[in-house]
């Protein structure tokens, strides 16, 4: 999700792609870079309007994928259908008032879009408002009994507004040890968790303080992601158990709020990192209101099956999310389509290219499932729905690979494994890497929490070993400095914005090598009898062991 674009001369690019293809062909067939290019260009064109769920862009995406899988001769995966229904609710906040804080030294007001964003998970369609709600600073908003940590200790926040820091208390440490894994983010650091816990505590409103470093993206990403239509999972109670208001506030406005309350955000943040932190009643009251335009709709996951020959009831899973943001915050040139070329037309196209290569290589012992999921950008909703309602039993799912935002920065000496050391799939990847003369490395920025930000996480939580890697930050041309520069350029100028667009001059050599790796890992999983597992002591090991025990 975070890289772009140093270019190679076309002749060198062609040579690199050809070499990668020849290496992969040793196992049967090379995933086609031409298929990748064709589909990425098409999926990220303005015709698809940014591929937001519940739009014309979704319908065009679904048709394209079903047509591609049918062309290849795959089978519809869901009882004769290419699709799995995913019930969603589209909620668009309208006529938002400023988020105002009163009762302090001076009133503070934050304007929607530029200084704050708000919305709701509640799907009843009623206008949303909190008025004169007492405000409590709850640090990182974490309640983790197993770690002896409770940021809500000693305070009742029912009906109140909680202000929460993003990430978790250890993120600034250099080590990978500590109550929250040191610099490596835990799920307690994700914004999704913050809102989940605030709802469990009964908060009327939950507001996260944006900070670029611990959030891992700038305010521009919050703007483009949180303004406009939002997708929410439907439920029987219309999500009445969720906080009435959720949202973000800019760092500058958060500092102004704290100053008005006689507090200092820097000092409070430092205190929140220490064990025994106690929530702080700020002595101010919050008010905000907005109307909700609600539309229930049935989005869809795409499920394609390549049946196995001798173990057809054992499944290898390939995943990628087809969705992006649709219409979004306008760029200065007036462009308001977030095309999502890298994120994630590349992963979606890779799904088809891998299916194509496996068809050409011939059948495997195990079945292979190619799953394009919806609403990843809204919190992994499509993947979570499949994981809760699997078309193919997760206990019979051997493992899989997830593809999200393939790197077009050029060939790299390494791949960055998100969650390296968690499962036996690392060994499968190492064998594939040897054929590409590349190495697996750990995340350079584990504090950004990439492990919890893509669809593999939904399956890992159910015990299925999933491999997710990025294309590498040690570029053949320019090394790590060039890799870091490409990542910075993408994050700041393209990620979740209108400029994530297809470029005919992209360097596809690294993509070809990455495709070869996905292919080899998936092919080995599909042709052996082994059942990879999580390493001993991993958070998902016991879940996997229990599910496997039921099948024996």
Residue ranges and their predicted role:
Residues 14-15:
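C-terminal motif of bacterial Sec signal peptides marking the signal peptidase cleavage site
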Residues 30-48, 53-76, 100-102, 106, ...:
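Catalytic-core environment of secreted peptidases
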């Amino acid at each position: 999700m975070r890289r772009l674009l140093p270019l190679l001369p076309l002749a060198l690019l062609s040579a690199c792609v050809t070499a990668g293809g020849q290496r992969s062909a040793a196992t049967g067939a090379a995933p086609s870079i031409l298929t990748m290019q064709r589909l990425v260009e098409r999926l990220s064109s303005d015709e698809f309007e940014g591929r937001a769920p519940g739009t014309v862009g979704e319908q065009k995406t679904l048709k394209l994928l079903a047509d591609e899988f049918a062309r290849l001769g795959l089978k519809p995966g869901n009882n004769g259908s290419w699709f799995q229904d995913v019930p969603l609710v589209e909620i668009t906040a309208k006529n938002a008032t400023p988020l105002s804080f009163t009762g302090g030294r001076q009133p503070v007001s934050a304007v929607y879009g530029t200084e704050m964003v708000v919305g709701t998970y509640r799907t009843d369609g009623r206008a949303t408002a909190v008025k004169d709600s007492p405000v409590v600073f709850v640090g990182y908003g974490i309640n983790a009994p197993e770690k002896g940590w409770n940021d809500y200790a000693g305070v009742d926040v029912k009906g109140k507004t909680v202000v929460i820091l993003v990430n978790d208390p250890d993120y600034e440490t250099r080590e990978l040890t500590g109550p929250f894994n040191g610099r490596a983010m835990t799920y307690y650091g994700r914004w999704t968790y913050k809102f989940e816990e605030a709802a469990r505590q009964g908060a009327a409103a939950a507001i996260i303080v944006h900070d670029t470093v611990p959030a891992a993206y700038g305010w521009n990403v919050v703007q483009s992601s949180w303004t406009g239509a939002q997708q929410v999972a439907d439920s029987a109670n219309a999500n009445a158990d969720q906080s009435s208001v959720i949202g973000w506030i800019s760092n500058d406005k958060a500092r102004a709020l704290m100053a008005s309350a006689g507090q200092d955000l820097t000092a409070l943040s430092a205190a929140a990192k220490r064990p025994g932190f106690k929530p702080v009643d700020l002595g101010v009251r919050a008010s905000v209101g907005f109307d909700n335009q609600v539309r229930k709709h049935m989005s869809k996951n795409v499920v394609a099956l390549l049946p196995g020959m001798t173990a057809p009831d054992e499944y290898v899973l390939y995943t990628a999310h087809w969705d992006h943001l649709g219409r979004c915050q306008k760029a200065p040139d007036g462009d308001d389509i977030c095309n999502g070329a890298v994120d994630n037309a590349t992963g979606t196209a890779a799904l088809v290219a891998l299916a194509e290569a496996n068809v050409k290589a011939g059948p495997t012992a195990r079945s292979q499932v190619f799953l394009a999921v919806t609403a990843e950008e809204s919190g992994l909703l499509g993947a979570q729905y499949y994981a809760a309602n699997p078309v193919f039993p997760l206990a019979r799912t051997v493992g899989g690979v997830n593809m999200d935002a393939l790197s077009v920065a050029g060939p790299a000496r390494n791949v960055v494994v998100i969650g390296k050391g968690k499962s036996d799939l690392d060994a499968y990847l190492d064998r594939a890497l040897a054929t590409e003369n590349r190495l697996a490395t750990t995340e350079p920025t584990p504090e950004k929490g990439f492990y919890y930000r893509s669809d593999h996480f939904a399956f890992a939580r159910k015990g299925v070993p999933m491999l997710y890697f990025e294309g590498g930050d040690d570029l053949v041309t320019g090394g790590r400095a060039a890799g870091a520069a490409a990542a910075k350029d993408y994050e700041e100028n393209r990620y979740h914005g209108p400029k994530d667009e297809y470029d005919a001059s992209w360097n596809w050599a690294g993509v070809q090598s990455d495709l070869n790796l996905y292919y080899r890992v998936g092919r080995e999983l599909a042709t052996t009898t082994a059942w990879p597992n999580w390493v001993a002591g991993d958070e998902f090991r016991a879940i996997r062991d229990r599910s496997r025990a039921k099948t024996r």
